[in-house]
Amino acid sequence: MNILTLINALPGAAAQGLIWGIMAIGVYLTFRILDVADLTVDGTMCTGGAVCVMMLMSGHSVWVSMLAATGAGMLAGLATGIFHTFMGIPAILAGILTQLGLYSANLKIMGKANQAVNGNKFDLLVSLRNVKNVPFYQNTIFIVAIFIVVLIAILYWFFGTELGCSLRATGCNPNMSRAQGINTDVCKVLGLMISNGLVALSSALLAQYQGFADVYMGRGAIVIGLAAVIIGEAIFGKIFHNFALRLLSVAFGSILYYLVLQTVIWMGIDTDLLKMLSALVVAVFLAVPYWKAKYFSKPTKRGGNK
């Protein structure tokens, strides 16, 4: 094991972590803000990349392609929202149904299981080859970091508006929100649309970065997103109390996840076990608060002092 091999691979892992960090922020919005487990992510993570690649191949600019990808993701979130709120289907099952439908949609969009986009023929915003030895303004890490800062600023502003506060209230206490006259169904649909729009945007960047879109590129995306959320909260939760900083901690969690993943690969551990390791990491971090409350919390005293 050559340590230089690991050091050379870390910038690429950081870049990939940042790209997936945008997806993780989308997962955070449904998982923590709306209190909904949205499994649409696995399908949307392919849809965004598929739309972006096909738009680029049709001659559109990279910005138009990414905007179209984001719109496609929002439509996927709209479908899940309609299944859940207006058809009464449980959120988890609604996400699975949309994810299942998106598999066929993604095949139709690309015409086959995968579609490559050549960085020499198309003007891409990010690329694997732009991680090292390029001017800083062309560096993938710098570009995606700017994206994340701008997105967090927009989300921080939005969730401070009346509509954003209604959305947060819906996730916190839907019954009280309805009593205050908030249309919780509309808020849930809107939250799912925003979340899946961010996931699709991340997918569009990932497709450019790796040079192709694949119908299976979203497999296990929800596990990666949850891992980033849980790791970010576990490490930075006691430091970052502001909403914007909490979103930033999710992006940091994604970076740490991919840095650890790269280290695991460098150590020679079988890559077939990576998904299992990811699932175990998420399970353990989710169990920690429960274990702390059950086994390590001090018993509360009842009654007055004698």
Name every feature range the model reports, one short phrase each.
Residues 91, 95-160, 190, 214-215, ...:
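Transmembrane helix-bundle core of multi-pass membrane transporters
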Residues 32-37, 78-121, 212-215, 227-248:
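Short loop segments and helix-boundary regions at transmembrane helix junctions
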Residues 1-23, 51, 59-64, 126, ...:
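Membrane-interfacial amphipathic/re-entrant helices at transmembrane-helix boundaries
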Residues 27, 60-100, 105, 148-149, ...:
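Alpha-helical transmembrane segments within multi-pass membrane transporters and channels
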Residues 172-179, 183-186, 245-248, 260-306:
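Cytosolic-side transmembrane-helix boundaries in multi-pass membrane proteins
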Residues 76, 137-218, 222:
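Helix-loop-helix "hairpin" substructures at the membrane interface of multi-pass membrane proteins
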Residues 199-203, 209-275:
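Transmembrane alpha-helical segments in multi-pass inner-membrane proteins
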Residues 31-86, 133-134, 239, 266:
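Membrane-embedded helix boundary and interhelical linker motif in transport proteins
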